[in-house]
Amino acid sequence: MAAESLPFAFETVSSWELEAWYEDLQEVLSSDEIGGTYISSPGNEEEESKTFTTLDPASLAWLTEEPGPAEVTSTSQSPRSPDSSQSSMAQEEEEEDQGRTRKRKQSGQCAARAGKQRMKEKEQENERKVAQLAEENERLKLEIERLTREVETTRRALIDRMVSLHQA
């Protein structure tokens, strides 16, 4: 399984959010190991329905478009009776939630792309700075060598002059 970058700048997320996301990820991964389906004992259809209707799809918004638990929430509901207006309302709410989740996924992916772009730009800027500093360092080394030679030449000239004044 390949790691993906986060859809946001790392410093904008609080530790409690990261912890909650980590717990959600653990739940998703454990359900993936089981096969991505929810297995219930016979006669628990009502409890199963509660489980999947209370699952918050927004917590899974950062997942990729790959099939997984987000699809399970939409397909694993108990059968509806045709005269039940509550179940149709619940279905509409769930569809709205899934629509919001898709929008969040898309905006999260856009944010991830923007974050990656900023990281690339920052990396390129840092590389330019390193190159500039290396050039500046080399220039300063050459300047130090030149000044060292000049000081040595001046020192010799001064010593020669003092010796010639002493002899005269």
Swiss-Prot record:
Residues 133-147 are annotated as: Leucine-zipper. The modification Phosphoserine is found at S14, S15, S30, S31, S78, S81. GO terms for molecular function: cAMP response element binding protein binding; DNA binding; DNA-binding transcription activator activity, RNA polymerase II-specific; DNA-binding transcription factor activity; identical protein binding; leucine zipper domain binding; protein heterodimerization activity; protein homodimerization activity. This is DNA damage-inducible transcript 3 protein. Ubiquitinated, leading to its degradation by the proteasome. Phosphorylation at serine residues by MAPK14 enhances its transcriptional activation activity while phosphorylation at serine residues by CK2 inhibits its transcriptional activation activity. It comes from Rattus norvegicus (Rat). Its main location: cytoplasm. The keyword Nucleotidyltransferase does not apply. Multifunctional transcription factor in ER stress response. Plays an essential role in the response to a wide variety of cell stresses and induces cell cycle arrest and apoptosis in response to ER stress. Plays a dual role both as an inhibitor of CCAAT/enhancer-binding protein (C/EBP) function and as an activator of other genes. Acts as a dominant-negative regulator of C/EBP-induced transcription: dimerizes with members of the C/EBP family, impairs their association with C/EBP binding sites in the promoter regions, and inhibits the expression of C/EBP regulated genes.
